[in-house]
Amino acid sequence: MTDTALAAPFECPLRTVEHEWVDYNGHLNMAYYHVLFDQSLDKLFNDLGIGWDYTKQGEGSCFTAEVHVCYLDELLEGDEVRITYQVLDADAKRLHVFAHMYHAEKGYLAATSEQMCIHVDMKTRRAAPFPEASQKKIEALAKAHAGLARPEQAGRVIGIKRK
């Protein structure tokens, strides 16, 4: 990643809504929003050195501790989807990321996903610090993203507001 690319939200490869992902309402089923967010996060993890190549070495991996998805607009079969990731915060063991899912052609925001990831030592299956090289990349990305606007949906809590 170049310094210029660091300052913008991280762009993931475009994806297309597949036929098998459409439910009886005729739109992308809620579970597949998670699939798209998860598979797109793999691209960011690969660039940070904590993706599949790292995980299959058996030393460490990233687990999801919490995720919150907001469904804002429909996606239909065949729609191309663009997903971006923004680092909201990070420390030695945790990575707090926020994703925006857009209809690639029409540009509207279809969904957001806020996620807390924890780095895990696969031998002990306990939280452990990121590898040093990855930690440096995460810190650089977090610093570059610090100037981005905080997403409107970040930090939301589920509940019914009572008067």
Please provide the spans of the model-predicted regions.
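Hot-dog-fold acyl-thioester-processing enzymes
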Residues: 2-64, 121-163
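Hydrophobic core residues within well-ordered beta-strands of beta-rich domains
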Residues: 11, 63-65, 81, 95, ...
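Generic short beta-strand
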Residues: 19, 99-101, 117
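Conserved GNAT-family N-acetyltransferase fold
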Residues: 37, 99, 113
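Hydrophobic beta-sheet segments that form the core/acyl-binding groove
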Residues: 68-104
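Solvent-exposed strand-loop boundary residues in beta-sheet-rich modules
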Residues: 105-107, 123
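A structural signal for beta-strand boundary/capping segments at domain termini and interdomain linkers
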Residues: 108-109, 127
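Short hydrophobic alpha-helix segments
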Residues: 113-115, 131
